């Protein structure tokens, strides 16, 4: 039994749905007081701050499972305060205060090293809106940084994620189906009509 290719109307509907989802996700992320990006190994956060702030005016705390960035003082503005979705390596993580050419004039740049360098984060802190990590396509340069075995595992994970998303079998499921088909071909005398597979 062969599966039909999706019609152009189906593809157009999926594409429109995806654009709408992406626009909603971007709108949610735009409301955050910071911007963030990630690779499979780390997360970078930038927080625009007032040009008159100095490093000593800031209270930046990076722990294994949480982050807090605020202006010092009892009523100091809090930029981010919450739990990470996954642990970081505090000793490998850092922050700097940098001058920028665009207003408000400075930004806090935070670099977080992930403990598990094989997973994507859906958000920086668990109270923030999530992004759809299944839509992340890492740059080839970051994949090429990985050793052969790790790269193969990441590519397999990405393939399996896309397959699940489309309702198609993962690489492991496909391999099992291929083995079963081969076995059925080699043993036509066996009746598989009542077999429960899965």
UniProtKB/Swiss-Prot annotation:
One of its GO terms (cellular component) is cytoplasm. The modification Phosphoserine is found at residues 141, 193. Residues 1-29 are annotated as: Disordered. SUPFAM superfamilies: HSP20-like chaperones. It is found in: Cytoplasm, Cytoskeleton. Residues 29-125 form the CS domain. Its main location: cytoplasm. InterPro entries: CS_dom (IPR007052), HSP20-like_chaperone (IPR008978), NudC_fam (IPR037898). The keyword Cytoplasm applies. One of its GO terms (molecular function) is unfolded protein binding. Keywords: Cell cycle, Cell division, Cytoplasm, Cytoskeleton, Karyogamy, Microtubule, Mitosis, Phosphoprotein. Residues 12-25 have a biased composition (Basic and acidic residues). GO terms for biological process: cell division; fungal-type cell wall organization; karyogamy; nuclear migration along microtubule; protein folding. The keyword Cytoplasm applies. Belongs to the nudC family. Required for nuclear movement. May interact between microtubules and nuclei and/or may be involved in the generation of force used to move nuclei during interphase. This is Nuclear movement protein nudC. It comes from Emericella nidulans (strain FGSC A4 / ATCC 38163 / CBS 112.46 / NRRL 194 / M139) (Aspergillus nidulans).
């Amino acid at each position: 039994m062969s599966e039909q290719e999706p019609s152009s109307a189906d593809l157009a509907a999926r594409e429109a749905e995806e654009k709408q989802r992406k626009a909603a996700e971007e709108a949610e992320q735009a409301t955050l007081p910071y911007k963030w990006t990630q690779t499979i190994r780390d997360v970078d956060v930038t927080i625009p701050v007032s040009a008159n702030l100095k490093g000593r005016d800031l209270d930046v705390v990076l722990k294994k499972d949480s982050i807090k960035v605020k202006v010092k003082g009892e009523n100091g503005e809090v930029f981010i305060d919450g739990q990470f979705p996954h642990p970081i390596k505090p000793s490998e993580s850092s922050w700097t205060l940098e001058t920028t050419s665009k207003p408000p004039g400075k930004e806090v740049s935070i670099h977080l090293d992930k403990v598990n360098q094989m997973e994507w984060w859906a958000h920086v802190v668990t109270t923030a809106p999530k992004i759809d990590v299944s839509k992340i396509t890492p740059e080839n340069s970051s994949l090429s940084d990985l050793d052969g075995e790790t790269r193969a595992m990441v590519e397999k994970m990405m393939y399996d994620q896309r397959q699940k998303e489309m309702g198609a079998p993962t690489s492991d499921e496909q391999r099992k189906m291929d083995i079963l088909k081969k076995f059925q071909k080699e043993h036509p005398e066996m009746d598989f009509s009542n077999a429960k597979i899965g």
